[in-house]
From Swiss-Prot:
The modification Phosphothreonine is found at residues 158, 218, 270, 348. This is WD repeat-containing protein 44. Residues 1-14, 466-475 have a biased composition (Acidic residues). Transmembrane segments: none annotated. It comes from Bos taurus.
Length: 912
């Protein structure tokens, strides 16, 4: 709206100048005058009789009489020549009175007097005035040639009228001159007239006629003629106009008005957003004093416990009650209301579910939502955010199909009659040359049989999944080496063919693990999923440090406010875990990097957890399908704050430079930037389009832009400062079945190269260059058709890893090794390496950000027991985690649909 008002003011300015400058000069040179215009002018003169009387009192009678005598002499000389012409002109006007005709006959004589008296002044000012006239006519008005009518007998009249008009800008510019003040008074009368002749000429005609008392304006032409003579100064009349303004210069468009929420966010944006990364290293552990006291001085650009625990503990997503364009939202702030019947009675839950119809797109059948749980495949969440939840039949079928495809590929490369393989499997078991292949097939079919039995068992005895003993079945695959495979046509050398499983963290999660995230230092692992509980796993060499931090808060009176009942339950589980974790460790398993039991468990969510995010000082955010985001801290046992949303919260991310702010994406189509200390939404925006479901969100370019992924395959970028739309990428293929965008499941930035990694449900991973939004690389080979699986980079960004629906963990090189591949497309990467260590869908797979912390743990543990806690940790953190390339070692973690978590260590061969 601001831009429109500015535009109106710009176009109004020339009109103001036009009115103030004098006559609108569409008609400066016309001689033919209509009687109607003359009548209007005379009426205007009568209305201004008081003004003329004042002028008559100020002029001496001698000057008046002398000028009248001279005018009568000139009239007698030129009366005969111009009398006929004046009458002819008056006859042409319609409805002209007789008095007007007589006055018009005297116009040339009076104007001739004006010309004689002003002849001297015209000679001195002719050059300046002509230049001003040309400039004024070019700037504000059209050309005089287009509107003038050439009349031979009125040449003098034209010159005098033009001279009278030329005096207008002269008198305006010289405001301080006493003589010019009187001319300005006449300009007032001239600006009010819209006739072809100047107003001063009309005044002369009217003042000559003595028969009409209202028109006794004879002094006016004398005053005009005597403007060059010194007259006593007098104040200007009140009707005087200000001098004309020049046309306004073109000015740039004003910046858009900022909303109140944006101004508040900018006010909160202290220079800490620009603090370099070196000032706060994410790899060094916070000291005990920093974590316990939480002083603002030590962590000014970061979130501290004092601000996190202050204010409301439950925050609603009101977005300050304003829409992106500043309009107030009334219905959304009030929240959804329960529908009512025609009589006004509130509907029950059963009635609401029965009124909503669900259509099965495969069969076309429509059923009420109340029966959807029984009719539709179980395990699918309402908005397809993740894969099957309770039964594994659909997953098993997909896995079997992928296994059959894998066997078909091996059959094509086999030279021993691959097509007869299925018919002669039992016979080949007895053949010496096929013993290895027979064992492989038996292993494949055995695993599928076990999976089928497990799926049936889980359906019939679903509650038995909560029994920790059920995880013992998962130990069967680890009695033999990890299965490795590579892409067809990828002949090696391989980087992960020697990978080994060093730890199995199964038995804790009761259901699928949907997300896993490492802390910035690499010593803590957070995992969450279907059982609504967040679990924190700590490295063995860092357990004592974090345990002391937690115990310090427990013994110092619990600085946090009174915990809720859910917090008390969480505290109880944390305390029990802390006591038992020190005694339940397996002393024989020295290669296991993590303690076998979680460091703590956070309970409070009432539905599946979908995403996690760590801050650099051990704050943790968790988002859930219960429409909330909860804030935790590693030293506290209760939830610090709960941020309520309107729909499922699919993605969250701390701001990389200022973790007082975090980003949340929800299925209501809104992207929110939350201010944790103020407990409110600082900025927000809404996705456009038919499909407004946000399924992924993250920051890129070190927090400069916020990126979200949608259900229809769009990556939309917003500038973080104002959360305004910047650009977008439609993630899809140019042709084929993937030409329609599919759900975005993950967005990961590639630091240092201005690129992002996008995972989608078309079983493709794409690397985009943000400089021109071009596709740098496309990775394929894994299966991701309906899950919330996302890919991520290794600690040195040389590799990327992803889970898969076919039970494998897939690894790609970020860029092609030209020494291995000579004739391949530079923007396609089909050369993957696969690892199979799970019997279910691999829902999450990540690299450890600091693998050196997990190597030689037996030596590090001995040093940590003999020295002070934290000294050895600080030595290990002297180098940033992103540049550790000295040892070619990777630590990989993967989680599956059953809740099992596996830890792998891979030592690559020395690079040449």
């Amino acid at each position: 709206m601001a831009s429109e008002s500015d535009t109106e003011e710009f176009f109004d300015a020339p009109e103001d100048v036009h009115l103030e400058g004098g006559d609108p000069i569409g008609y400066p040179g016309k001689v033919g005058i209509s009687a109607l215009k003359e009548t209007e002018n005379s009426a205007y003169k009568v209305g201004n009789e008081s003004t003329v009387q004042e002028l008559k009192q100020d002029v001496s009678k001698k000057i008046i009489e002398s000028i009248i005598e001279e005018s009568q002499k000139v009239i007698q000389l030129e009366d005969d020549s111009l009398d006929s012409k004046g009458k002819g002109q008056s006859d042409q006007a319609t409805a002209s009175p007789v008095t007007a005709g007589t006055e018009l006959s005297n116009i040339p004589g009076l104007l001739a007097i004006d010309q004689v008296l002003q002849e001297d002044s015209q000679k001195a000012e002719s050059q300046d005035v002509s230049e001003e006239t040309e400039l004024e006519s070019k700037q504000c008005f059209p050309s005089d040639d287009t509107c003038e009518k050439p009349v031979d007998e009125t040449t003098k009249l034209t010159e005098i009228s033009s001279t009278a008009q030329l005096n207008v800008p002269e008198t305006v510019t010289e405001v301080l001159n006493k003589e010019e003040v009187e001319v300005k008074e006449s300009d007032v009368l001239e600006s009010a007239s819209s006739h072809s002749l100047s107003t001063k000429d009309f005044a002369v005609v009217e003042e000559v006629a003595p028969a009409k008392p209202p028109r006794q304006l004879t002094p006016e032409p004398d005053i005009v003629a005597s403007t060059k003579k010194p007259v006593p100064a007098r104040p200007p009349p009140p009707a005087n106009f200000p001098p004309p303004r020049p046309p306004p210069p073109s000015r740039p468009a004003p910046p858009p008005r900022k909303k109140k929420s944006e101004l508040e966010f900018e006010a909160l944006k202290t220079p800490d957003l620009d603090v370099p990364k070196e000032n706060i290293t994410s790899d060094t552990l916070l000291t005990t004093n920093m974590a316990s006291e939480s002083t603002v001085k030590d962590s000014q650009p970061s979130l501290d416990l004092a601000s996190a625990t202050s204010g409301d503990k439950i925050v609603t997503a009101q977005e300050n009650g304003k829409a992106p364009d500043g309009q107030t939202i009334a219905g959304e702030v009030m929240g959804p209301q329960r529908p009512r019947s025609n009589s006004g009675r509130e509907l029950t839950d059963e009635e609401i579910l029965a009124s909503v119809m669900i259509k099965n797109l495969d069969t076309g059948e429509e059923i009420p939502l109340s029966l959807a749980e029984e009719k539709l495949p179980t395990g699918i969440n309402p908005l397809t955010l993740h894969i099957m939840r309770r039964t594994k039949e659909y997953v098993s079928n997909d896995a079997a199909q992928s296994d059959d495809e894998e066997k078909l590929q091996s059959q094509q490369t086999d030279t021993d009659g691959g097509r007869l393989k299925q018919k002669t499997t039992q016979l080949k078991k007895f053949l010496g040359k096929s013993v290895k292949r027979a064992k492989h097939l038996a292993e494949e079919y055995g695993e599928r049989a076990v999976n089928k039995v497990k799926s049936v068992r889980d359906e019939v005895f679903h509650t038995d999944q909560d029994d920790p003993s059920s995880s013992d079945d998962e130990g069967m695959p680890y009695t033999r080496p990890v299965k490795f495979k590579a892409a067809h046509g990828f002949k090696g050398p391989y980087d992960f063919d020697q990978i080994k499983v060093v730890q199995d963290l199964s038995g804790e999660h009761m259901g699928a693990v949907w997300t896993m995230k490492f802390s910035h230092c690499g010593r803590l692992l957070a995992s969450a999923g279907q059982d609504n509980v967040v679990r924190i796993w700590a490295l063995k060499n860092a357990f004592d440090y974090f345990n002391n931090m937690r115990m310090k808060y427990n013994t110092e009176g619990r600085v946090s406010p009174s915990p809720s009942q859910e917090s008390l339950n969480s505290s109880k589980s944390d305390t029990d875990t802390g006591v038992c974790s020190g005694t339940d460790e397996d002393p024989d398993d020295k290669n296991a990097p993590f303690r076998q039991r979680p460091f703590c468990k956070y309970k409070g969510h009432t539905a599946d957890l979908l995403d996690l995010s760590w801050s650099k000082n051990y704050f943790l955010l968790s988002s859930s399908m219960d429409k909330t985001v909860r804030l935790w801290h590693i030293s506290r046992r209760e939830c610090l704050c709960c941020f309520q949303h309107i729909d499922f919260v699919t993605a969250i991310a701390f701001h990389p430079r200022d973790d007082r702010y975090f980003l949340s994406g929800s299925l209501d189509g809104k992207l929110r930037l939350w201010n944790i200390p103020d407990k409110k939404v600082a900025l927000w925006n809404e996705v456009d389009g038919q499909t407004k479901l946000i399924t992924a969100a993250n920051f890129c370019q070190n927090g400069k832009y916020a990126v979200i992924g949608t259900y229809d395959g769009r990556c939309i970028f917003y500038d973080t400062e104002h959360l305004k739309y910047h650009t977008q990428i439609h993630v899809r293929s140019t042709r084929g079945r993937n030409k329609v965008g599919r759900k975005i499941t993950g967005i990961e930035p590639l630091p240092g190269e201005n690129k992002i990694l996008v995972t989608s449900n078309d079983s493709r991973i794409r690397l985009y260059d943000l400089r021109d939004l071009s596709l740098s690389m496309k990775y394929k080979g894994y299966v991701n058709s309906s899950s919330q699986i996302k890919a991520s980079f290794s600690h040195d960004f040389n590799y990327l890893v992803s889970g898969s629906e076919d039970k494998y963990v897939y690894i790609w090189s970020t860029y092609h090794d030209l020494s291995k591949f000579t004739s391949v497309r530079r923007d396609r990467n089909d050369f993957w390496e696969g690892i199979k260590a799970h019997n279910a869908v691999v829902t999450s797979a990540i690299f450890a950000p600091n693998p050196s912390l997990m190597l030689s743990l037996d030596v590090q543990s001995e040093k940590s027991e003999g020295n002070e806690k934290g000294e050895d940790a600080e030595v290990l953190e002297t180098m940033p985690s992103g540049i550790m390339k000295t040892d070619n070692t990777e630590v990989l973690l993967s989680a599956d649909f059953t809740g099992a978590i596996k830890v792998f260590i891979n030592k690559r061969k020395n690079l040449s």
